[in-house]
Amino acid sequence: MARVMTAQIRQYTTPIDTSVPDSKRKYIPSSGTYPRGFRVSGTHVGVKPSNTTFPDLALISSDEPCSAAAVFTTNRFQAAPVQVSKQILEAREGRGIRGVVVNAGCANAVTGKGGLEDAKSMSAKVDECNGLNSTGGQGDSSTLVMSTGVIGQRLPIQKILSGIPTGYSNLSSTHAAWLKTARAICTTDTFPKLVSQTFTLPSSPDRTYHIAGMTKGAGMIHPNMATLLGIICTDAPIAPSALQSLLTHAVSRSFNSISIDGDTSTNDTVALLANGAAGGQPISSPTSPEYTAMQSILTGFAQSLAQLVVRDGEGATKFVTVRVQNSPSHSDAKLIASTIARSPLVKTALYGKDANWGRILCAAGYTQGLSPGTLVPERTSVSFKPVDGSAELKLVVNGEPEVVDEERAAAILQDEDLEIVVDLGGGNQGEAAKGGEDALYWFCDFSHEYVTINGDYRT
């Protein structure tokens, strides 16, 4: 039977409201609660010549200096803004950061010394707007830089430098401003990705803190850190010494636990800024209740942002969670989960609504780098967990195939959301390791549209 194709229209940058696919509108917040002392703006400067309307320059600014931390791409061809932002954070030891400037439409990657100078000039221009005299990229710079878009092209730097003062003059703390800023960092995304929430900490349960973040990404996503950008801001007081470890833990279990196409970009960056504007005692000790609480809050928040990236995967029709459980270690469970998430055969089977569990086991079986005895075939089980809360559909139990109700399997695969559970049964430790470590990974399927989008990307 012929498959009926419904194309999603992908623009260079996030389209106006009327172009957001109906299925994605529910992910765009109509309101938000934002951290004190942060203001943001999204401005059109026309980084890409074909963009004549949409905002493509984002500014995130704190009224007071922030503690800051970031996690960057592991790609050896690190883009100029990655190198410059690393340099700024190292020189300042995570202190005194005032904000972030982001352009969409050009990655400023593999652009040589000129690209580095462009990134530094973006940082210096924002500092100038803040009344600071900096050279960009040195110890006196206080603005981090991010870029996303096509690799190997120089920035239209004069357009950007001319647009920064306009963006600075339009800084605002309103929901509309945050949403427009989230739009400004997008490329092939079909919707802006913005999340905000309030929280409390054990030492001051009556004090309300805020956290807000935006992210972009729809393709070239298999972070360690892909083109994936994330900016998270909070008004909680967090010492620089604690901020990096908090972010690293959160990213490991969120942005580094998603995959769309298995590619890792030159530009990936997730930054966390904390200005302490809500008051209270700074979080500093990793053994304190405040640190433990903040770690849980930040990790859950980062997962919410990262999952939006998967939901907007290029050409995606499925949002899939793979849970590997009862593993002797978290790292081994994550290796297996990531291998399944990257498998083109698994992803295409899910697009075709085919309950082909053999592809899942095959991917698990060729996972590289596992500790000896982690994966024992006769202890391994696979099931589908429906989103409606009904009983799991068992596909394989302790290495033995189950008689599968194909009609129920087909019904489960009709839903957009699916959870695949791979139970290792404790590996060669058996019952002793049951109740052991779990890992979650989020990914999407591969469709015909993914090929179409990426075949046309530069145009």
UniProtKB/Swiss-Prot annotation:
One of its GO terms (cellular component) is mitochondrial matrix. It holds the Pfam family ArgJ. The active site is at 227 (nucleophile). Coiled coil: none annotated. It is found in: Mitochondrion matrix. GO terms for molecular function: glutamate N-acetyltransferase activity; L-glutamate N-acetyltransferase activity. One of its GO terms (biological process) is L-arginine biosynthetic process. Pathway: Amino-acid biosynthesis; L-arginine biosynthesis; L-ornithine and N-acetyl-L-glutamate from L-glutamate and N(2)-acetyl-L-ornithine (cyclic): step 1/1; Amino-acid biosynthesis; L-arginine biosynthesis; N(2)-acetyl-L-ornithine from L-glutamate: step 1/4. It comes from the Eukaryota. CDD domains: OAT. Keywords: Acyltransferase, Amino-acid biosynthesis, Arginine biosynthesis, Autocatalytic cleavage, Mitochondrion, Multifunctional enzyme, Transferase. The alpha and beta chains are autoproteolytically processed from a single precursor protein within the mitochondrion. Its EC number is 2.3.1.35, 2.3.1.1. The record marks 226-227 as: Cleavage. Substrate binds at residues 187, 216, 227, 314, 454, 459. The record marks 148-149 as: Involved in the stabilization of negative charge on the oxyanion by the formation of the oxyanion hole. It is an enzyme of class 2 (transferase). It catalyses: N(2)-acetyl-L-ornithine + L-glutamate = N-acetyl-L-glutamate + L-ornithine; L-glutamate + acetyl-CoA = N-acetyl-L-glutamate + CoA + H(+). Heterodimer of an alpha and a beta chain. This protein may be expected to contain an N-terminal transit peptide but none has been predicted. Catalyzes two activities which are involved in the cyclic version of arginine biosynthesis: the synthesis of acetylglutamate from glutamate and acetyl-CoA, and of ornithine by transacetylation between acetylornithine and glutamate. Belongs to the ArgJ family. This is Arginine biosynthesis bifunctional protein ArgJ, mitochondrial. It comes from Uncinocarpus reesii (strain UAMH 1704).
